[in-house]
């Protein structure tokens, strides 16, 4: 469907390529599924694939980050977005912090530099940077891309000058009007409710016509 509708850039986001960490933070995908999805996308002709990773996840140090970066280097994506871990209020980690008291949350210059060097080896350069609240190590998120593959959309949405059409449960559509007025249109979060109310979710976006 994506190829049929001429989608030219997609994201396949592992967050980490360490299965132990994925299980710990409640992510339901596996490392193998990430690799399979990437190879499938390549075989279908997608030539601008971004991958997001998070540095500073619980229990991860230089060795774990190296494992993730080596896996990404083998896959050879066109963009990599390196996120410094930020604890969000609604995330599993924030809601169950008592379960993680014995686990360290680390992000350091050394770890960030290892990620940076991998991106350089892949022929990428940094093209955008932004920060969030509660970020590990007081670092920032950095987008890297090969020549001609930068996700300009990322910059536009961070500057809030680009309308966004969101599909699916929990999606948040954003409409930017002339003069800078912004209107958000939220989809319901529960998947079953979204399916049951799909016509309503569509009607909410009539403002985009």
Mark where each language-model region is.
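Conserved non-cysteine loop/helix-boundary elements of the Radical SAM core domain that shape
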Residues: 1-115
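Short, glycine-/Ser/Thr-/acidic-enriched flexible segments
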Residues: 56, 134, 170-173
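A broadly tuned preference for mixed-charge, low-complexity surface segments
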Residues: 1-5, 41, 66, 128-140, ...
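Detector for Asparagine
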Residues: 13, 18, 48-50, 134, ...
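Radical SAM enzyme core and accessory elements
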Residues: 143-209
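Context-gated lysine
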Residues: 3-4, 20, 28, 88, ...
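A C-terminal junction/extension of Radical SAM enzymes
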Residues: 90-167
């Amino acid at each position: 469907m994506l190829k049929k509708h001429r989608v030219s850039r997609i994201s396949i986001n592992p967050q980490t390529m360490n299965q132990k960490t994925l299980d710990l933070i409640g992510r339901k995908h596996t490392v193998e599924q990430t690799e399979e999805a990437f190879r499938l996308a390549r075989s279908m002709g997608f030539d601008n694939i971004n991958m997001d990773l998070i540095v500073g996840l619980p229990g991860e140090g230089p060795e774990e980050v190296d494992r993730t970066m080596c896996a990404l280097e083998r896959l050879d994506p066109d963009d990599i977005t390196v996120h410094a871990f930020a604890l969000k209020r609604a995330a599993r980690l924030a809601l169950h912090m008592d379960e993680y008291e014995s686990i360290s949350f680390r992000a350091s210059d050394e770890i960030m530099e290892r990620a940076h060097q991998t991106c350089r080896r892949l022929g990428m350069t940094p093209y955008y940077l932004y920060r969030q609240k509660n970020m590990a190590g007081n670092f920032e998120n950095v987008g890297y891309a090969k020549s001609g593959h930068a996700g300009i959309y990322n910059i536009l949405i961070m500057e809030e000058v680009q309308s966004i059409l969101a599909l699916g449960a929990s999606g948040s559509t954003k409409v930017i009007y002339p003069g800078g007025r912004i209107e958000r249109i939220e989809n319901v979060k529960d998947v079953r409710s979204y399916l049951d109310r799909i016509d309503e979710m569509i009607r909410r976006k009539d403002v985009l016509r």
